[in-house]
UniProtKB/Swiss-Prot annotation:
Gene3D superfamilies: 3.20.20.210. Keywords: Cytoplasm, Decarboxylase, Lyase, Porphyrin biosynthesis. It is an enzyme of class 4 (lyase). One of its GO terms (molecular function) is uroporphyrinogen decarboxylase activity. Catalyzes the decarboxylation of four acetate groups of uroporphyrinogen-III to yield coproporphyrinogen-III. Its main location: cytoplasm. This is Uroporphyrinogen decarboxylase. GO terms for cellular component: cytosol. Belongs to the uroporphyrinogen decarboxylase family. PROSITE patterns: UROD_1, UROD_2. Substrate binds at residues 29-33, 48, 79, 155, 210, 330. It is found in: Cytoplasm. It comes from Bordetella bronchiseptica (strain ATCC BAA-588 / NCTC 13252 / RB50) (Alcaligenes bronchisepticus).
Length: 358
């Protein structure tokens, strides 16, 4: 695939802690239900999976937020559960219930059936990456992503989202051997999956460890971070003549920042409970940081959003040898007012230009 030269590489340079003229911004779940145009496309597709498994629809919704806002990166429209779906677990999105699996992994016989899926069964994802890259035409970089081995395992064992993680923690404490086997398979599958996204044209990749923060200290390192590190160590890090940065985001992982930063990633994503300046001192600018505005700030109105954006940028401090990508501390809420996102993007770009110039 012939690719257009990148017109805006500020996001990639910030991830690599290179000098940039301003702080780049993108938002987790930026292509999503808060946008009326997304809901219209989803209605045409008929279902979430109808949207995610059709490269043209996936491309359409990936580009929608960029038509509204001058964001500095696009992120592939997909779901972290495509990999276990390809393992045969039967992913379904019930209206109002979120994702669930028809065949959760609960015992030894279930684990014995698991295998790294043939990446050809996920071709629709890689086709979407190629389509999006073509349509972006070098405007901004494209981010690929996957769930961390632990986070995917939570859904695989629980069968759906959970409030207490009782089923997977029962396995963790009662049959850790089974859980390690699941995590080994997940790590291998995720490595292949992300490398295939990179081969298709993803210019950066992100691992979402959405549920790492539910683990006790010591167990996080053993059951989450160790397998995240396996994935990161096996990724293609050079493509199209430049480095492919890797972002690792553990929601609730503030106490483990130093250890996450040492896993081989280029950037660590932060949730909103962590002070950016403190986090920066703790990782000593060894990696870039991404985050970390509370998503609920968007419900406070334009003035509050602009003030909190400035506060977040000030918290990071003088850029110097550090790297900062502005984002929310978690995915944007489906109820967020789209017009306030415009205020956020404008404030980050305008205010940070002055900071970088000084």
């Amino acid at each position: 695939m012939s690719v257009a030269p990148l017109k805006n590489d500020v996001f990639l340079r910030a991830l690599l802690r290179e000098p940039v003229p301003y702080t780049p911004i993108w938002l987790m779940r930026q292509a999503g239900r808060y946008l009326p145009e997304y809901n219209a496309t989803r209605a045409r597709a008929g279902s979430f999976m109808g949207l995610a498994q059709n490269p043209d629809y996936a491309c359409e919704v990936t580009l929608q937020p960029l038509a509204r806002y001058p964001l500095d990166a696009a992120i592939l429209f997909s779901d972290i559960l495509t990999v276990p779906h390809a393992m045969g677990l039967g992913l379904d999105f019930a209206p109002g219930e979120g994702p669930r699996f028809a065949h959760p992994v609960r015992d030894e016989s279930d684990v014995a059936k698991l295998a790294v899926p043939d990446m050809d069964s996920l071709r629709y994802v890689f086709d979407a990456v190629r389509t999006i890259r073509r349509e972006l035409d070098g405007r901004v970089p494209l981010i690929g992503f996957a769930g961390s081995p632990w986070t995917i395992a939570c859904y695989m064992v629980e069968g759906r989202g959970s409030d207490d993680y009782r089923l997977i923690k029962s396995m963790l404490y009662g049959r850790p051997d089974l859980l390690h086997r699941i995590l080994e398979i997940n790590a291998e599958a995720t490595r292949h999956y992300l490398n295939a996204q990179i081969d298709a044209g993803a210019q950066a990749v992100m691992l979402f460890d959405s549920w790492g923060g539910v683990l006790a200290d010591g167990l996080f390192q053993q059951f989450s971070l160790a397998y995240t590190r396996r994935v990161v160590e096996g990724l293609t890090r050079e493509r199209e003549g430049r480095r492919v940065p890797v972002i690792v985001f553990t929601k609730g992982g503030g106490q483990w920042l130093e250890e996450i930063a040492a896993c081989g990633c280029d950037a660590v994503g932060l949730d909103w409970t962590v002070n950016l300046g403190t986090a920066r001192r703790r990782v000593a600018d060894a990696v870039a940081l991404q985050g970390n505005l509370d998503p609920m700030t968007l419900f406070g109105g334009a003035q509050a959003v602009r003030a909190e954006a400035r506060r977040t940028l000030d918290a990071f401090g003088p850029v110097g040898k550090g790297g900062h990508v502005f984002n929310l501390g978690h995915g944007i809420s489906q109820y967020s007012p789209p017009e306030v996102v415009s205020e956020l993007v404008d404030e980050v770009h305008t205010y940070s230009r002055a900071l970088h110039a000084g």
